[in-house]
């Protein structure tokens, strides 16, 4: 079957965007893996799918599949690209839309400067809802929050890291490091992602505090690996930093792919994320009917 697509990127986090507003392509997990494959497919961190409104008061449904083909709840950088795509393709005339994801409703807003702001909703701290199993763990208390110990074992070598856990529609474990350039992201990332305390796996964030309004961040994404940027990861890191008493309520997040601005007023307030969303090219790909 021949599938049209648009390649997009937001702060270096890259996506294949599919329009299923006129009908579904019927793609399998293997199809999504092939689309994301950088050697045999188009290449992307995630595959984003646009579907028609599933309910009154909602403009579109937004599906996300990671590079491993698994469907996930949320993708912040993808949400900005989603909003840019539906406007550029004439699927809506609105600057602000309401979008249903598996992780809840989000509200992207196209700004006059070309950037997109996304209301990502309020962070979730209830451990069962993240989900995070803290059985047998003794946390450290810092600021308004707790940091949880995770025992990591690789090739017989054991270490313990302390993480703050939060859901931004998808689960995140954030640790503070002295220098993101030397942080063991590729070693610890997969160990944290698959840690037994996270029954649905987790995104692992490594945050360096530059000052109270500036952090540097690397994220090892669940099902994808390290990416140039992670929007929901940036939101989770800022929320963690604020709750730990380390950050102010508006923070510039520097990633390898660009800078995002994250604002959070605390408590049950929504997290606002602002950043770029850029079309790269349009194309078509032939996919096997049965895969």
Curated annotation (Swiss-Prot):
Q: Is Amino-acid biosynthesis there in the keyword field? A: yes
Q: Where in the cell is it found?
A: Cytoplasm
Major location, coarse class?
A: cytoplasm
GO terms for MF: diaminopimelate epimerase activity
Q: What is its EC number?
A: 5.1.1.7
Q: Where is this site: Could be important to modulate the pK values of the two catalytic cysteine residues?
A: 172, 221
- Indicate the residues that form the catalytic site: 75, 230
Q: In which pathway does it act?
A: Amino-acid biosynthesis; L-lysine biosynthesis via DAP pathway; DL-2,6-diaminopimelate from LL-2,6-diaminopimelate: step 1/1
Cystine bridges: none
Would I find Amino-acid biosynthesis among this entry's keywords?
A: yes
Q: Which UniProt keywords apply?
A: Amino-acid biosynthesis, Cytoplasm, Isomerase, Lysine biosynthesis
Enumerate the residues binding substrate. Answer: 13, 46, 66, 76-77, 170, 203, 221-222, 231-232
Q: One GO biological process from the UniProt record?
A: lysine biosynthetic process via diaminopimelate
Q: Name one GO cellular component term.
A: cytosol
Q: What family is this protein classified in? A: Belongs to the diaminopimelate epimerase family.
Q: HAMAP family this protein is in?
A: DAP_epimerase
Please state what the protein is called.
Diaminopimelate epimerase
Organism this protein belongs to: Albidiferax ferrireducens (strain ATCC BAA-621 / DSM 15236 / T118) (Rhodoferax ferrireducens)
């Amino acid at each position: 079957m021949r599938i049209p697509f648009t390649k997009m990127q937001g702060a270096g986090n890259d996506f294949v965007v599919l329009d299923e507003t006129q009908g579904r392509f019927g793609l399998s997990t293997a199809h999504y893996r092939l689309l994301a494959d950088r050697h045999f497919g188009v290449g992307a961190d995630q595959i984003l799918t646009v579907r028609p409104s599933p309910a009154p008061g909602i403009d579109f449904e937004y599906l996300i599949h990671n590079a491993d083909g698994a469907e996930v709840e949320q993708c912040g950088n993808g949400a900005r690209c989603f909003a840019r795509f539906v406007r550029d393709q004439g699927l809506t005339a609105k600057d602000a839309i309401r979008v249903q994801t598996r992780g809840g409703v989000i509200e992207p807003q196209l700004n006059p400067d070309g950037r997109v702001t996304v209301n990502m909703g309020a962070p979730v701290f209830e451990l069962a809802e993240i989900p995070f199993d803290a059985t047998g763990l003794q946390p450290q208390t810092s600021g308004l929050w707790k940091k949880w110990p995770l025992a990591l074992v690789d090739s017989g070598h054991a270490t313990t890291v302390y993480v703050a856990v939060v859901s931004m529609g998808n689960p995140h474990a954030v640790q503070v490091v002295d220098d993101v350039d030397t942080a063991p992201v590729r070693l610890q990332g997969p160990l944290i992602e698959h840690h037994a305390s996270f029954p649905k796996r987790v995104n692992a964030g490594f945050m360096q505090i530059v000052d109270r309004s500036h952090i540097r961040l690397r994220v090892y994404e669940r099902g994808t690996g390290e990416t140039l940027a992670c929007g929901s990861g940036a939101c989770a890191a800022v929320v963690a930093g604020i709750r730990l008493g380390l950050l102010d309520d508006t923070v510039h997040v520097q990633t390898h792919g660009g800078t995002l601005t994250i604002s959070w007023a605390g408590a049950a307030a929504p997290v606002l994320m602002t950043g770029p969303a850029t079309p790269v090219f349009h194309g078509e790909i032939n996919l096997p009917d049965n895969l």
